[in-house]
Amino acid sequence: MKIIFAGTPEFAATALAALLKTSHEIIAVYTQPDRKAGRGQKLTPSPVKQLVLEYNIPVYQPLHFKASTEEGLAAQQELAALGADVMVVAAYGLILPQAVLDTPKYGCLNIHGSLLPRWRGAAPIQRAIATGDDETGITIMQMAAGLDTGDMMYKTYCPITSEDTSATLHDKLAAQGATAICAVLESEETLQKYLAEREVQDESLTVYAHKLVKSEARIDWSMNAVQVDRNIRAFNPWPVAFIQLDENNALRVWYSTISNQNKADAKAGEIIAIDKQGVHVACGENTFICLTSVQWPGGKALNAQQIAQTQKLHVGQILP
């Protein structure tokens, strides 16, 4: 089949890499425009574009597909002229109007990082961890105009462990997504079968995974330790959980575990011990967490042993 692929970050690049190994013809790749990145603020292509530059495949980077503008209408016409059988979309980042969704012979298929209709939206991996879900997965759906509202065609399941961060879970789901889309597109007959058997989402089960904002990564010591630990894992690698030491300085917290220490009358945010395991801090409901990797401004991430050696934190200190 002739496939258009649309995606931007590593999650999408993993799926594209798998599709490139199949007998299908990737006739075009759509990705977000190059963005400034890094300390030098150099224009940097997306992971999807970086991958596809090794192949002789045309890359398109429209700003949008809005038919109300000349450039948007031109982008729609350009895509239609490609004559694709199907378009695969994974974390593309642009809204696709119905005219685009209807263009390929079999429409547009989306690789979504949750078990829909739970966690529609921008941050399904992070929200699943922060909420304490014990399972997530991949849904392949036929796209509709609404946000992740399309009919479901295929699902895979992935347990969420107590050690999973958004980084580790992302990589597991990226691999599952790649396998899933290749299974759905094994042949034209297979695709027709999954399209015929597709399932409408139950709107009553919908939960939205709202976009992350940096401010919510600030640690709230009044929460119990289990919730603090979930948030630390959910916000790794971005925006990274932090302790606001003062107006200008934040201590980033990369990793934690539930503490085996306790203190009867500890205040929320109080450091009750510092040892080879890490920094033990009191949380809400008389629970305790152990911070095992932290990073001071301008420094690198430190492990438990290095934290103790800095002597920047002390027992009895109340963290804000």
UniProtKB/Swiss-Prot annotation:
Annotated catalysed reactions: L-methionyl-tRNA(fMet) + (6R)-10-formyltetrahydrofolate = N-formyl-L-methionyl-tRNA(fMet) + (6S)-5,6,7,8-tetrahydrofolate + H(+)
EC class of the enzyme, as a word: transferase
Classification via CDD domains: FMT_core_Met-tRNA-FMT_N, Met_tRNA_FMT_C
Matches recorded under SUPFAM superfamilies: FMT C-terminal domain-like, Formyltransferase
Keywords: Protein biosynthesis, Transferase
Pfam families linked to this entry: Formyl_trans_C, Formyl_trans_N
Binding residues for (6S)-5,6,7,8-tetrahydrofolate: 114-117
Single annotated GO MF: methionyl-tRNA formyltransferase activity
Cellular component per GO, a single term: cytosol
Cited InterPro entries: Fmt, Formyl_trans_C, Formyl_trans_C_sf, Formyl_transf_N, Formyl_transf_N_sf, Formyl_transferase-like_C_sf, Met-tRNA-FMT_C, Met-tRNA-FMT_N
EC number of the protein: 2.1.2.9
Function description: Attaches a formyl group to the free amino group of methionyl-tRNA(fMet). The formyl group appears to play a dual role in the initiator identity of N-formylmethionyl-tRNA by promoting its recognition by IF2 and preventing the misappropriation of this tRNA by the elongation apparatus.
Homology family: Belongs to the Fmt family.
Protein name, UniProt field: Methionyl-tRNA formyltransferase
Organism: Acinetobacter baumannii (strain SDF)
Source taxonomy: Bacteria, Pseudomonadati, Pseudomonadota, Gammaproteobacteria, Moraxellales
